[in-house]
Every structure is written in structure tokens, then in C-alpha cells.
Amino acid sequence: EDGKSLPEIAGHYFNIYFKGVMLLFTAMLLFFVGVVFIMSPAGLLSNLDYFKDTIFGNNTFWVLVILAYYFLATMLPIDKIITKLYPAFGLLMIVMTTSIAVALLINAPQLPEMGDVFAYFNHSHYNNELLEPNPDGLPIWPLLFVTITCGAISGFHSTQAPIIARCLTNEKYVRPVYYGAMVCEGIVACVWALAGVAAFPGGYPELKAMLDLGGPGLVVNHIATGYLGVLGGVMAIVAVAVFPITSGDTAFRSLRLTIVDAFNIPQSLRNRLLLSVPILAIAYFMTL
């Protein structure tokens, strides 16, 4: 669709009213995702033991640093910052995931067996420990499939698709890029899910105790250092900080492009400033 944003595609195939609904919904989604990915990495970075009692242990410091980067990523052409950094981030993800997968094969941990998965559908699933609802009472159906789906494709990913489409030089690259990315991310999700199951033999209560203690960052660090030692710990720290930021920068960039597409606003420097500054200013005040 020539790199059109999601509301534009909805308007093309449905009508202008549906386009308006999608525009509002998409803009809200992108904005709040961006805000979350200011607060999340800032919190993770400021809580690192290495930064204790220094300016780097100040949450506001990291919020401002991340906002400054988001401003540049939102304003500047995509080939100036984002495409320069993302290959390195992608390499980090590939190296971490491959290393974890190899470590799992070498260590060959004892994993719980699913057993008869179809037993879940004939009401005898409570006999299988792995299929019991977790202590919070959340059922495995449909939450398991929500989790798996988010590892391969999600509503947020669909808002990022136009950015990639506008970077492709030929339509023949569409299938290998989009389908390949979906398959790769699915594999990454499966490897980390397997690593998570193996790293917490005590099951969900053990995982929840660590989440309550230090959040997802501590869990990633525990898994990475457990399988890869000191090197894994270093990669985990970088990954936990960097990967949320790569979602936040494209969220705000997509928000600007979605508004520009909807109202046919020329992308002059002045117009980009008039859009980016208020959006990021509001985002900052929402982090306070």
C-alpha cells in the first residue's frame, strides 16, 4: 500500500468514519506505548547497582536522556539515526538468543512435559501441573496464545510496518523482510520462553518472586548470567535498556507520520518541530 499508515489503509478499504476511528485509536496506542518506553528503560537503568549513589542512578536523568534521543529519532530522517543503530541492536539480539539456545542444548535441563495437551479441553487438565491456572488465578487459555502471538506479530507491530515499507527499494523484498522478521521474532520468543522455563524449576511462584523483587530486568539478567556468565550479564544489561528504547523511538516517529499522513501535512522542518515538540512535552509530563 505504498507505505501508507494503518488509518490510511483502513480508510481506503472501508470509509472515512472508520479511518477516523482508527486514527484516534492508533494515535493513542502509539503515544502511550512511547510513554511506557520512556519510563520503563529509565527505571531499569536508574536501578542498576553500578549506578548507585551517582547521577546515573537518578530516574529523571535517564528520562531526559531518553527523551532527547526520541526527539532526534522522531525529527530526523530515518537513515540518520535509526538505521545506523538498529543493525547493532539486531546483532545483539541474535547473539544473545543464539548463545542462550546453544547453552540450553549443552546443559540439557530437565523441562516439564506438557503431556496430553488435549486433556485441557476435556476438563481433566487440573491433573496436569503445567496446565493449572497460575496462583493469581489467570487461565492458561487464552493467555498463552496472547503471549505467543505477541512474540510474532501484534497490533503495535502493524503500526511500524509503514516505516519498513518506506525503506524497501523493491517490492520483491516485502515477503522475505516481513515474513522473515515474523518467523525470527517467533523463534526468539520460543528460545527465551524455553530458557525461562528451564531457569525457574520452581515454576510460576519462583518467577513471580523474582519479578516482585526486581521486575523483568532482573529476570533477564538471571537467565543470561545463569547460562552465559559475566558476558551474559553485560549483554543483558545492554539489552534490557536498549530494546524498550527501540520501541519507544519508532512509536513516536510512527505517531508523527500517522498524523502527517492523515492531514497531508508537508514534512518541512518547521512542521516536524510543531508536531514533535508538543507530543514529547506531553509525554514528559506524563512521566512525572
Features from the language model and the residues they span:
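Helix-loop junctions at the membrane interface of multi-pass solute transporters
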Residues: 1, 71, 147-182, 193, ...
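Hydrophobic transmembrane alpha-helices that form the core helical bundles
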Residues: 1-53, 241-263
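Hydrophobic, small-residue-rich membrane helices and short re-entrant helix-turn-helix hairpins
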Residues: 6-7, 76-90, 156-189, 206-220, ...
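Loop-to-transmembrane helix boundary motifs in multi-pass membrane proteins
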Residues: 19-20, 56-65, 180-191, 197-198, ...
